[in-house]
Regions:
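Rossmann-like NAD(P) dinucleotide-binding subdomain of oxidoreductase/dehydrogenase enzymes
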Residues: 1-88
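Structural motif
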Residues: 29-31, 60-64, 100-102, 184, ...
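NAD(P)-dependent aldehyde/semialdehyde dehydrogenase
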Residues: 81, 90-203, 213-257
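Residues that line or immediately flank small-molecule/substrate-binding pockets and catalytic motifs
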Residues: 32, 209, 233
Length: 258
């Protein structure tokens, strides 16, 4: 691989060099969020050049509460470990890390308590919350409690898990983003209840206890968003299919000979 690629590092403020690279590339890939995309797009490409962009995205997690209620202690600990990998490894900053947790089923209250308490015990051994992050996290909680109109209740499981239970999902729910173990929650009976909120900013849906066939039917129901549906624990697994784009094909020139 080393012989096939060149890596160039320069200051991001160097617009002239960004302009030069844009003018000679066949394909420009911008991976850095919506703000970065807007900044770089001011530099034109060649007429036949193409572009792949990876903008800011929003992800969510779906849990079947009845299945969690029936889990034995070993399997529950394994589940929270996988959830930890999806969320806390990058402090919820990854585009595929969930911010919104959906609880499906009638036994959600008991399952919620069981899940979060088990995760809290795991975090005490694994996760170190910086002092500044702790302050910012609490400040965000205070702001949400005061300003959110769809706020129902809040709960803290130590200082490492903050949850805010919502009484409804607004169409701009993708603006509700947490860090360092800050999650928004909502209870549902079926997936049709969240169809109206899914826009093209939604990327990854992680799940546990829900039949794959049910999820396939849901995401194929003319949704504008959700490009990935993976089990809990696989949110950060990168592949050549990302953000709904087949990257390998997008970077390949096809010569048609008949």
């Amino acid at each position: 691989v080393k012989k096939l690629i060149n890596i160039i590092r320069y200051e991001k403020e160097n617009d002239e060099f960004t302009k030069f690279l844009s003018s000679i590339c066949d394909v420009r890939i911008i991976w850095g969020g919506s703000k970065t995309i807007k900044a770089i797009r001011k530099f034109p490409l060649q007429e036949r050049s193409s572009e792949l962009t990876f903008a800011d995205r929003y992800s969510l997690c779906l849990l079947d509460s009845k299945k969690i209620e029936k889990l034995n202690e070993f399997d529950l600990k394994l589940l929270v470990k996988r959830f930890y990998n999806d969320t806390y490894l990058f402090d919820q900053n990854a585009c595929s890390s969930p911010h919104l947790i959906l609880w499906m089923g009638n036994s959600s209250s008991f399952s919620r308590q069981r899940f979060w308490k088990t995760l809290s015990l795991y975090l005490e051994e694994k996760y170190n919350l910086p002092e500044k992050a702790s302050y910012d996290k609490y400040n965000k909680l205070c702001n949400d409690v005061v300003n959110l109109k769809n706020f129902k209740s809040q709960e803290k499981f130590g200082n490492l898990i903050y949850t805010l239970l919502l009484n409804k999902l607004d169409e701009d729910v993708d603006k509700m983003r947490g860090k360092w173990g800050y999650f928004y929650e909502y209870k549902i009976n079926n997936l049709n209840q969240i169809k109206k909120i899914i826009n093209n900013k939604f990327q990854t849906l992680t799940y546990f206890g829900v039949e794959k066939k049910l999820l396939q039917t849901f995401v194929k129901n003319n949704l504008r968003g959700i490009d990935r549906v993976v089990p809990i624990g696989q949110a950060l697994d990168i592949s050549l299919n990302w953000d709904g784009i087949d990257i390998n094909n997008a970077l390949t020139r096809v010569i048609d000979i008949k």
